[in-house]
Amino acid sequence: MTDTRKQRAAVILAAGKGTRMKSPLPKVMHAVGGRPMMDWSIALARQVGAERIVAVVHPSQDVLIAHLGKHHPDVAIAYQDPPQGTGHAVRCAEEALRGFEGDLAVLYGDSPLVPAATIEDLFGTLSDKTGLGVLGFEAEDPGLYGRLITGEDGSLEAIVEAREATPFQLRVRLCNSGVMAGRAADMFRLLAKVTNSNAKGEYYLTDLVGLARAEGIRCAVAVSGEDDLIGCDSKADLAEAEAIFQQKRRRALMEAGVTMVAPETVFLSHDTQIGADAVIEPNVVFGPGVKVAGGAQIRAFSHLEGAVVGEGCSVGPYARLRPGTVLAANVHIGNFVETKNTAMGEGAKANHLAYLGDGTIGAGANIGAGTIFCNYDGFLKHQTDVGEGAFVGSNSALVAPVRIGDGAYIGSGSVITKDVPDDALAVGRGQQITREGWARNYRAKKAAEKAARTTDQNKKG
């Protein structure tokens, strides 16, 4: 079957100052689910098949501009300076979309939770007769939201701001999200007719509805849930969006077979992957880039980021897995163990109080309590390799670069600076000296000294 769907493009509005965030960081660079809000909007545009994406930014947003250049080099950048409203912002993207003849969606860089299915529905309202679609939501408390006024046939007749609405219109709960889609050529042509004859002296995107209808272009409405369309203008909004995201992701994972003992205390990232029948205990934080296989157990108060956890592993409680950690099946990581850029083979164990950085640990190896991989010399990081079935005794320091051979034993309390062959024993510690009766004589001597000092002080007093 031939795909007759029109080409798609997206303009993402991100030039707002975000003064209510009270932060030097551009508003759209604040994160939800461990991901900048701008990245959520770019991902949304990609999910709905936008072949061309334009980010409208302010020239002063150096952090945002650098981020786009590094992580999204295919996203075109258009500058809005000074900001003069949403309609003006979209017009700033016109040059970047020169020659584009498909459908265009206008998205917002501070709305991180819009589902792709919702934008598909919005594009779906467009047809030969319907040239403009607006995304709305049924507000629990419409308040100051603009109202979407529809006709008997369901078409959109007007967007009315709350301050200009009649008492009858204020009873309407269908509100404007600001997200819009239409034929790109028509949208830019109509935008050229928008004026700034209003109290703020700005060019409003919402004016397109009246201009389109005046030309006989039908306008339509697609509806989404209110939570999906939350915009984040303040830290309070950001926290609300985070709570919505976490609740939805937790539920999705539990419905997929993940056990969460206290789900409200588990915090996930946008890309967290957890397999069926894994168990997540209370107060666990997943930073970006974590993949947990089925049957694994992540115990309480653990923090994972950039880590891969194999099937049947046990992690924690109070463990920290940092980026580059890869655990094969049935690995045990216990309390107060930190790993970074380290791979552990099947069945390897580090059950207590250890730092394992920049290393490999072979299958079945045992890392004793208090073991430290001394990986940093003040300038460079170095590698520690522990072979299969090796045993590292408690309170050992392995000074990298160093290799512990397969089946080798390291005596407790050792400082190891040289490679250890397979099946060898290495002990690097001071020799024990035992003096029988020394403690008894020492106590008697000190007791006498104390008594003499007390007698002398009494004479002086």
Curated annotation (Swiss-Prot):
The active site is at residue 352. Pathway: Nucleotide-sugar biosynthesis; UDP-N-acetyl-alpha-D-glucosamine biosynthesis; N-acetyl-alpha-D-glucosamine 1-phosphate from alpha-D-glucosamine 6-phosphate (route II): step 2/2; Nucleotide-sugar biosynthesis; UDP-N-acetyl-alpha-D-glucosamine biosynthesis; UDP-N-acetyl-alpha-D-glucosamine from N-acetyl-alpha-D-glucosamine 1-phosphate: step 1/1; Bacterial outer membrane biogenesis; LPS lipid A biosynthesis. The gene is glmU. InterPro entries: Bifunctional_GlmU, GlmU-like, GlmU_C_LbH, Hexapep, Hexapep_transf_CS, MobA-like_NTP_Trfase, Nucleotide-diphossugar_trans, Trimer_LpxA-like_sf. It catalyses: alpha-D-glucosamine 1-phosphate + acetyl-CoA = N-acetyl-alpha-D-glucosamine 1-phosphate + CoA + H(+); N-acetyl-alpha-D-glucosamine 1-phosphate + UTP + H(+) = UDP-N-acetyl-alpha-D-glucosamine + diphosphate. It comes from Hyphomonas neptunium (strain ATCC 15444). Residues 236-256 are annotated as: Linker. Mg(2+) binds at residue 110. UDP-N-acetyl-alpha-D-glucosamine binds at residues 13-16, 27, 80, 85-86, 108-110, 146, 161, 176, 322, 340, 355, 366. Acetyl-CoA binds at residues 369, 375-376, 394, 412, 429. This is Bifunctional protein GlmU. It holds the Pfam family Hexapep. Its cofactor is Mg(2+). One of its GO terms (biological process) is cell wall organization.
